[in-house]
């Protein structure tokens, strides 16, 4: 098996785990274009309500997990059962938090493959690999926080964590799915990046090891935010808000 075959297997494995669909360069990027500079108020409302609903659903799931683990801890199950269950739950949240979102959160390389990128931009495969690494770290630091909080899920650090995940999913909808390169700039800064900084600070106060582990994602999101900004600059610098789109025939 040659090097390229090994690389292909690794890429397929990583993309499968992270749910990333490979880009198709022959496929049109989307069937809508902005013909005016008018703010798409409907899109803003959809993003806002979609994010809020996802956060509420995940908070309810946290509550459900707390009740389930409380039952397990008060039963005759071995002590490791609740820890294993918590780890699996945080793994699901870290890799597939988008299942709780009503928005289209398809993970695809299509946008990244087709836009103009700076020379220093990482190769497309780097993103799912890095995010898979971050997902593993998320499981570790979330379990640490959960243990620090006496097996409680409905606590401030974990609530802020699911808020961070929801904001990241909404950004994915804006950038990857709908290719709104302008709106993606402020959203990536005020959403995933800022929330990661806040969560890191709260985690650090609760458990310093968890805070240090989470800081890696802050570094990566800083790189990602700069990359999103440069992609916006290189692809026309459209307004930094969602533009009203018009359907076109391709």
Residue ranges and their predicted role:
Residues 2-250:
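Aromatic-rich, lipid-facing transmembrane alpha helices and their immediate juxtamembrane interface loops
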């Amino acid at each position: 098996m040659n090097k390229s075959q090994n690389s292909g297997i690794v890429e397929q494995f990583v993309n499968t785990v992270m749910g990333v669909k490979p880009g198709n360069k022959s496929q049109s990027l989307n069937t809508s274009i902005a013909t005016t500079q008018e703010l798409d108020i409907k899109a803003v409302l959809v993003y806002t309500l979609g994010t809020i609903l996802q956060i509420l659903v995940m908070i309810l799931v946290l509550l459900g997990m707390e009740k389930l683990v409380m039952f397990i801890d008060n039963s005759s199950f071995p002590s490791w059962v609740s820890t294993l269950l918590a780890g699996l739950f945080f793994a699901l949240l870290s890799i597939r938090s988008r299942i709780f979102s009503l928005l289209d959160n398809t993970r695809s390389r299509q946008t990244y493959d087709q836009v103009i990128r700076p020379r220093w931009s990482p190769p497309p495969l780097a993103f799912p690999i890095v995010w898979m690494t971050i997902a593993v770290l998320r499981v570790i630091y979330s379990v640490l926080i959960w243990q620090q909080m006496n097996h409680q899920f409905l606590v401030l650090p974990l609530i802020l964590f699911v808020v961070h995940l929801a904001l990241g999913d909404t950004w994915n909808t804006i950038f990857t799915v709908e290719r709104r390169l302008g709106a993606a700039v402020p959203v990536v800064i005020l959403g995933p990046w800022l929330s990661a900084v806040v969560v890191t600070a709260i985690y650090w106060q609760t458990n310093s090891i968890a805070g240090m582990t989470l800081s890696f994602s802050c570094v990566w999101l800083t790189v990602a935010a700069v990359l999103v900004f440069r992609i916006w600059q290189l692809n026309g610098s459209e307004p930094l808000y969602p533009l009203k789109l018009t359907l076109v025939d391709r």
